[in-house]
Amino acid sequence: MDSQPGIKAYNSVSLSLYNWWVLSVANRFAWRCSTSEVQLPFYRQHLSSRHLEIGAGTGYYPRHCMNISQLTLLDLNTECLFQALRRIGPARVKATVRHDIFLPFPEHLHQRYNSVALYYVLHCLNGSAEDKFTALKNATQALTADGIMFGATISGEPQRHNLFGRILMKVMNHKGIFTNYHDSAALLESQLGQLFREVTV
């Protein structure tokens, strides 16, 4: 299993276009899940003051939330960490961690956060359903006993998408940016049910 293909797409050039293309265009027209109307309010609703952001991206979501007192960014891609840190502001970020989510988390991150977010991470992970379950299980190591994990992902179920979404998903899988043809809401709910007492998908 190679966790690298998806992250290689995110460099300084692509990240400069990310907010426009992904958060404005694709979210609204391909995935029909508006950033401003759905995803950001959902993020704010589940956020805590001690928060771990897995998959730093451009830092868009934590940048638009001022109530995080202890924010840690975790990503395998150093450019994502750099860009997110720059956009959020170094004073607001307690730590950045370069780590592969397929591997167990460092002990200093265990049981430390009241919330963990995985926004647009799972569908980019290059691995099987079992591999993605391992990633989810690893991420739970960072949660306190009453902590919450939340996020957003793109299902591989074609019937859930319009024509634009189906075409875009095919292109992204072909390029190796997505690996989500076998991802489904039912599978995700089943996997999360093995890790948490309460699950909503």
Regions found by a protein language model. Give the residues of each.
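Class I SAM-dependent methyltransferase SAM/SAH-binding core
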Residues: 50-105
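Short catalytic micro-motifs in class I SAM-dependent methyltransferases
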Residues: 119-124
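A short, conserved alpha-helix within the catalytic core of class I
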Residues: 125-138
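Class I S-adenosylmethionine-dependent transferase superfamily signal
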Residues: 138-140, 192
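Short glycine-dipeptide loop
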Residues: 143-149
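C-terminal alpha-helical "lid/dimerization" subdomain adjacent to the S-adenosyl-L-methionine
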Residues: 150-199
